[in-house]
């Protein structure tokens, strides 16, 4: 292949078991029934899918269901998927939300940020760019030994979705190596109330019960509860005698997790 081929697909099918393969991908990769494709994403997900023919059309079948589950896609979501044909057997997959933004954006300066944040005690990083220079298809891969368990303080009994784990991996390169954060899951933003009593929150690490945190979250979310708050930041400070699981860091930054009800408390 002399140049990469791009093809966008709107995910509208009600089935998780298959996906029609775009004609452009079929031609570029010269696909046939029985072939195998490797789907790859920016956060390192690599899954092989089988190609099958039905009614003169090719579909991704075995492996596609596993891919959408690992990528954090949900039924009923309005998503656009861009396939970038890397070779006859490899496709780079970029997922966009309904507003047209990459669901897991990685800025152009990722490679530079990684180099600047390194220290002699930090693990080695390798960074490479595999995308064309057009800003709409920017994609930087970063390989790091840091894993979710090293960075995220959460109760082991709390099951993290694939999307949350993928988002954690994507933002890891922009945090200091010593940085950790806590995940708080809000069952329903509208159920958070100011005042005394128990708040309808599940804490990711131990039991985060400081009312001032809940009040600040409520204050910041109540005005935006009717809007899409995915990826937006909250900023508030804690008094020195308040803490999150024993950490008295101030100020506290919080971020809404994209497409979830989770909030990150960055410490």
Curated annotation (Swiss-Prot):
GO terms for molecular function: DNA binding. It is found in: Nucleus. This is Putative B3 domain-containing protein LOC_Os07g12820. Residues 4-99 bind DNA. It comes from the Eukaryota. PROSITE patterns: B3 (PS50863). The lineage of its organism: Eukaryota, Viridiplantae, Streptophyta, Embryophyta, Tracheophyta. GO terms for cellular component: nucleus. The keyword Transcription regulation applies. Keywords: DNA-binding, Nucleus, Transcription, Transcription regulation. SMART domains: B3. Gene3D superfamilies: DNA-binding pseudobarrel domain. It comes from Oryza sativa subsp. japonica. Pfam families: B3. Its main location: nucleus.
